[in-house]
């Protein structure tokens, strides 16, 4: 923040980024661009272009922007380089306080869900998750609790708990807190439990949050994500090559547990 305004600066060597390319990306990430101020720095043998965007968030932001700043910057770079899709799922980087790889995981489940023949568009699914950031975040926590091989290591669990505790003020709105005052504490306490108890606690919390969803269509979509995760047998999400995550996410499903899956002919 600067002078009470929220700003996003892009530094690039050689040439400025094309504004018409950047705007849709920023909008899909939950920022409305109000103004742009371009600058150029002439250095010996080097031109550095600075684009200073004044932006207005379309999703709630926490008071401490340090972690959001880093996470958003990484996501925008990956998006700009064409390594992730430019769609409304990227809004969850800010709305649900998740990183770009966690967004890719949710996007992957959506792609599979659409293949099962659900009567919703991807854009509608994107809007549904963005409208319910607490549920989106708990779906991510459910995925980690099910599949993260380090989840039961105390140091790793403590780190996950601290992250959730830091983000919960943004992700869980006042309306949810007033209706479910014990939910946050219950979820945070679950991180020190064995894996099967973590799963039970997260699923219970998801069930309570889903009871607050008024739209039948949105309820069906969000429950479908939960059921797809329960039907997942394994994933490559945590596998690394040369110390880095793979550039794709894959899942293996037990098709008998996938809800409303058409029977083979």
List each language-model region with its residue ranges.
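Non-catalytic interaction/regulatory segments
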Residues: 1-31, 35-265
């Amino acid at each position: 923040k600067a002078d009470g305004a929220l700003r996003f600066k892009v530094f690039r060597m050689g040439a400025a980024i094309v504004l018409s390319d950047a705007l849709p990306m920023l909008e899909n990430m939950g920022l409305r661009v109000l103004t742009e101020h371009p600058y150029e720095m002439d250095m010996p043998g080097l031109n550095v272009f600075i684009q200073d965007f004044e932006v207005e968030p379309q999703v709630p932001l926490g008071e401490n922007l340090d972690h959001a700043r880093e996470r958003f910057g990484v996501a925008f770079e990956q998006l700009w380089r064409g390594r992730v899709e430019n769609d409304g799922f990227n809004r969850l980087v800010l709305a649900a306080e998740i990183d770009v790889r966690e967004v890719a995981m949710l996007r992957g489940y959506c792609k599979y869900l659409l293949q099962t023949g659900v009567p919703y568009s991807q854009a509608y699914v994107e809007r549904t998750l963005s409208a319910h950031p607490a549920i989106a975040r708990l779906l991510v926590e459910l995925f980690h609790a099910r599949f993260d091989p380090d989840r039961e290591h105390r140091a790793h669990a403590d780190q996950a708990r601290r992250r959730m505790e830091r983000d919960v003020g943004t992700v869980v709105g006042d309306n949810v807190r007033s209706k479910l005052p014990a939910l946050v504490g219950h979820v945070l306490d679950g991180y020190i439990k064995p894996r099967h108890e973590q799963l039970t606690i997260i699923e219970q919390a998801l069930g309570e949050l889903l009871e607050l969803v008024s739209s039948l269509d949105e309820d069906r979509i969000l429950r479908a994500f939960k059921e797809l995760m329960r039907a997942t047998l394994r994933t490559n999400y945590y596998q690394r090559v040369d110390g880095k995550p793979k550039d794709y996410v894959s899942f293996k499903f037990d098709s008998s547990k996938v809800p409303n899956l058409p029977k083979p002919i």
